[in-house]
Amino acid sequence: MPTKAGTKSTANKKTTKGPSKSGSAKGHTGKTHATALHHGMLYKDMVNIAKSKGIPIYQNGSRLTKSELEKKIKRSK
């Protein structure tokens, strides 16, 4: 019986590892999603593209965030 309990605990440990892995993978996919779309573009690059396409970088007196610039660049394509 004790051996069975021992194997059970290791099995449980394995299962706890599983979701944590998928969780980190999910977070990772979130990151790769944007970078894959824009090939790891930096904020400077986004600003340059926006300028070349005539997209305003400032809105309501403040600079647009990288994600907002991304959206506008995507729309203008």
Curated annotation (Swiss-Prot):
Induction: Expressed in the early phase of the viral replicative cycle.
GO CC term, one of those recorded: virion component
Low complexity composition bias: residue spans: 17-27
Primary location class: virion
GO MF annotation terms: DNA binding
Cell compartments where the protein resides: Virion
Keyword DNA-binding: yes
Polar residues bias: start-end ranges: 1-12
Residue segments, region Disordered: 1-38
Keyword terms, alphabetized: DNA-binding, Virion
Taxonomy, superkingdom: Viruses
Similarity field: Belongs to the asfivirus P10 family.
Protein purpose: May play a role in genome packaging through direct interaction with viral DNA. Binds to ssDNA and dsDNA with the same apparent affinity in vitro.
Protein name: Structural DNA-binding protein p10
